[in-house]
Amino acid sequence: MQNVYYIGLVSFFADISSEMVYPLIPLYLAAVFGATPALIGLIEGIAESVASLLKVYSGYLTDKYKKKKVVAFSGYATGVIYKIALILAASWAGILAARVIDRIGKGIRTAPRDVMVSESATPGCAGKAFGIHKSLDMAGSAIGILLAFLILYFGDGGYEYQKIFYLSLIPAGLSLLMFSKIKEKKEARVVMPREPFWRNVKLLDSRLKLYILVAFLFTLGNSSNVFLLLRAKSVGFDDTTVILLYFIYNATASLLAVPAGKRSDRVGRKQLLVAGYLVFAIVYFGFAFVEQKALMVVLFVLYGLYTAMIAGVERAFISEISPPRLKGTMLGLHSTVVGVALLPASSIAGILWTVWGAPAPFVFGACLSLLAALVLFLLMKGGLPETARD
């Protein structure tokens, strides 16, 4: 399990860097470039979806060439380029280009990193392993957000955004240095010379494919987190306090990720996933109708609980029910399907907000989450597989 901690530390430093700037993006777009919620949603949707198309191919290359560490390193290295692109951006189009670069890196690194976590886990403890990784990942996010908050809070105005973009390069570099500690499991290259990866996907258990469709359905209502930040600002929080709320969310998810992973090892992944979808529905209904600041803080805490229940547990579930020789491909396929859904999700959310007001995208997301929970529950009753068949 030691390798899991090293992989987690790579994500820890990378997320300090990323989350120093991520919650600032919607605020920066609105304040500096006059972007509307619809435009912000479109930018986030394009960035997430275009990059996510790479995830399944990245997973396929991981399975074929067994060069997980090299592929993951190249993805994390893209984070440095992203920060430089933010510094140089002179319009909302420049921010869009930077976000696409960032998400391309995530698309490249996600599948090989998750395979390394899965392979490094103690038998029977995949949930715990992914929980440890997610906990370190979210801890880095929380620290990055806190650093951004402190710089903005104690700054004198003017150039704090640019200052944060520059400082974020430091932890991005540290994440790359941590790769020297990771030991990759040596495997023989799998010879799949001319066979398209989707041909293997066709042979998978139909219930596994149905689960991926459930994830797609859920994601259509799970728009970018920037809408949570914009919603918090709409009820009266200033920019620095909005960032602090995002810190609370990440800190909560970090603290609860390992207990959630351990819980899934004991009671099963599917039960926790259904419960997570239900928590999400409660949170989104809350974001739709709550106007009191104190209750908004509670919602960010509950959103952290949802993330802890879903993120690591879902990856552990996919890695366990996928055939061993297609583990990277399936993790990548899942990420791609989710990413493709993010473009319409964020675009729909932006349009709903603009046309019908702030509550509309959250009601839409909550309803789709309830539907996804129902479908997943019915799949469980039908015997959704717990382990893979090769």
What kind of feature is each model-predicted range?
Residues 1, 184-214:
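Juxtamembrane intracellular "pre-TM" segments in multi-pass secondary transporters
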Residues 1-51, 207-245:
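Helix-loop boundary and gating motifs at the non-cytosolic
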Residues 27-32, 143-160, 344-360:
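Transmembrane alpha-helix termini and helix-breaking/packing motifs in multi-pass membrane transporters
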Residues 54-66, 152, 256-268, 353:
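Helix-to-loop junctions at the C-terminal end of transmembrane segments
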Residues 70-84, 169, 271-286, 366:
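Structural signature of the two symmetry-related core transmembrane helices
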Residues 98-139, 317:
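Cytoplasmic helix-loop-helix junction between adjacent transmembrane helices
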Residues 131-148, 335-345:
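Glycine-rich segments within core transmembrane alpha-helices of 12-TM secondary carriers
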Residues 169-189, 372-380:
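C-terminal membrane-cytosol helix-exit motif in multi-pass small-molecule transporters
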